């Protein structure tokens, strides 16, 4: 296991990240606190994509190890029980974008552990579109937020923050200013205070794209990882940093996206949803770390 704190200089390196800082003003460049204020776990497995029939089991183990480290427990189920009670009604907010959806084995791994905690199957729903009309999500007492990591035309990256846009009745109204108002969705009654876990699925992330609904396999790579945390802003900050470093490695520069992922910083500074300063995020790395990049 390796622990390190990513520096702000790492994150702000390159034109796109500099644009994020400029868009948000000088406040984010102030003196950082001495101690990390958020913890994020990156876990990778060299075999997770190699054997489709064993993928769910590997992902269950990856989630178990990540949560033990994240929450400081000796046993995985102890960690899961810190997040969810058997009496909870749980909505798993997934993402079904057809070109790069949340993998079914990952959804299955999450559901398996919810059942193991004692949540009854009738009180679990995995959904993306239609959550406003979904009876489980309507009465949910706990949410798990999971989505694939990719660039995004309107938001810079497909973030955990962005994944809740289906809770908004008028989704297109959140597109202006690089989706700056996404954090407000997390204040809605169906969402506020309910999210127990955020997972950026970095098994096969897309690190570059331009234009709406862009997808190109040239810009997808088998990273074979999960980025996990209870703080959605911190998880997204690490995820955005990973995509930035990959673009720099691939192109020889941090090639600009349609918009910088500035909504992540807004979610911190305006909506107070978490930590967007990399100098205040403790990143713990587990598992296979060849070409980890961060």
Task: Please state what every model-predicted region is.
Residues 1-294:
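N-terminal and secondary-structure boundary signal
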């Amino acid at each position: 296991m390796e622990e390190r704190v990513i520096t702000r200089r790492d994150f702000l390196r390159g034109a796109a990240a500099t644009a994020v800082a400029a868009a948000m003003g000088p406040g984010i460049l102030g003196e950082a606190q001495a101690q990390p204020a958020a913890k994020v776990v990156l876990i990778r497995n060299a075999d997770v994509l190699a054997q489709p029939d064993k993928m769910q089991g590997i992902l269950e183990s990856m989630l178990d190890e990540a949560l033990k480290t994240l929450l400081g427990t000796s046993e995985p189920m102890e960690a899961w029980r810190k997040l969810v009670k058997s009496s909870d009604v749980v909505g798993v907010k997934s993402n079904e974008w057809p070109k790069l959806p949340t993998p079914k084995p990952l959804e299955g791994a999450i559901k398996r552990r919810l059942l193991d905690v004692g949540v009854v199957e009738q009180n679990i729903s995995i959904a993306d579109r239609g959550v406003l009309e979904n009876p489980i999500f309507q009465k949910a007492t706990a949410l798990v937020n999971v989505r694939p990591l990719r660039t995004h035309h309107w938001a810079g990256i497909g973030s955990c923050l962005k994944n809740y846009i289906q809770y908004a009745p008028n989704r297109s109204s959140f597109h202006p200013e690089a989706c700056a108002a996404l954090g407000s969705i997390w204040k809605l009654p169906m969402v506020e205070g309910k999210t127990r876990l955020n997972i950026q699925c970095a098994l096969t992330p897309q690190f570059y794209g331009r234009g709406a609904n862009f997808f190109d396999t040239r810009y997808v790579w088998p990273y074979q990882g999960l980025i996990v945390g209870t703080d959605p802003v911190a998880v997204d900050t690490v995820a955005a940093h990973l995509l930035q470093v990959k673009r720099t490695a691939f192109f020889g520069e941090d090639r600009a996206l349609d918009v910088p992922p500035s909504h992540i910083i807004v979610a911190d500074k305006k909506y107070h949803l978490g930590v967007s300063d990399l100098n205040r995020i403790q990143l713990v790395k587990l598992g296979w770390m060849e070409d980890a990049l961060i």
